[in-house]
Amino acid sequence: MAGLPVDRAQRLLAELDRLRAELNVYRGHLLDVSLDPMGGVALAFADPPGLTRDDVVLPAAVLDRIERHALGVADHRAALLAAGQHLKRGLLLYGPPGTGKTHTTRYLLGQMSGYTRLVLTGRSLLAVGGVTDLARDLLPAVIALEDVDLVAEERSLGPASSPVLFDLLDAMDGAGPDADLLFLLTTNRADLLEPALAARPGRVDVAVEIALPDAPARERLLTLYGQNVPLALTEQDVNLAIERTDGTTASFLKELIRRSVLESLHDDPVLTAVTGAHLARALDDLLDSAQGVTRTLLGVGVDPADLPVGGLLHAGPGPRAWAGSSHRVTRRRFGSSGG
């Protein structure tokens, strides 16, 4: 740009920046974020989850509140701006493990086509600062942060590192109020996040509890998880199962259906029918006193306040699968501010 007047050169640079953001290959896609061994950030394109509202088993009022905050702002963006209302928002889903926070998040991500959706789980949460910078370039955007409590007190990436939770709050502050940017957080330990969020109000606008499923929800979950299974259950079979599974999680009920299928296959290698007897045997096994650890792993009887901070992160598997497939992994190295 040698020889150009300063103002003209600045306009040209601004236009190049605009085109770079507008034509960015990541724009409008669902992206799984991970860290590579060299400290860079890997972005993997993923197929959006094909979930519908009927696939989300929550009380109608709870799901309405979640949709209104996440999707309603997207539907009424122009009207909100015209009325002087901000678009940037934070939504926290909290509750015991296994109740459907991740499933609900996947549903929302699938509904927000046209948004750049960046999903951070596990140690990729350490790069929240840099990922937020990318999201601001690719608005409208969603940053989904799964199980924030697991790394809330860890140090972020970069020489001037700070606890990840404070980096997250700074990132939320850094986005302008008119930015159509949704921060979607999930946690099993709301008690760990609440003091910091309360000290800096306005970052999370809505916190929604995803509680243990009640009796009607448990019935819907059994139907949902058994939709591809040849269930041959009487009304009495279903009612007894609902009664005996009081206090269990969605994860527990999903495993119950799987084990019922295994019980049927044990009787006959050709799967023709899963009966009440199969369901009862599977439930007897899951509720057996020797299966206490199994129930804990399925979120049953777990007090979130008793969960370790960070311990599960280092012992557990890698990032969760957010869609049917991921492909085209590319790498982007962010500056020290965010990793």
Predicted regions and their residues:
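Loop/helix-junction capping segments adjacent to catalytic residues or to phosphate/diphosphate-binding pockets
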Residues: 6, 10, 191, 216, ...
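Generic structural signal for secondary-structure transition and capping sites
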Residues: 21, 75-78, 173, 177, ...
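Walker A/P-loop NTP-binding motif of AAA+ ATPase domains
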Residues: 53-239, 339
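C-terminal alpha-helical "lid" subdomain
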Residues: 200, 215-339
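Short, glycine/charged-rich beta-strand-loop motifs at protein surfaces that mediate ligand recognition
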Residues: 2-3, 209-210, 242-243
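Long, hydrophobic, amphipathic alpha-helical segments used as structural scaffolds
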Residues: 24-27, 81, 268
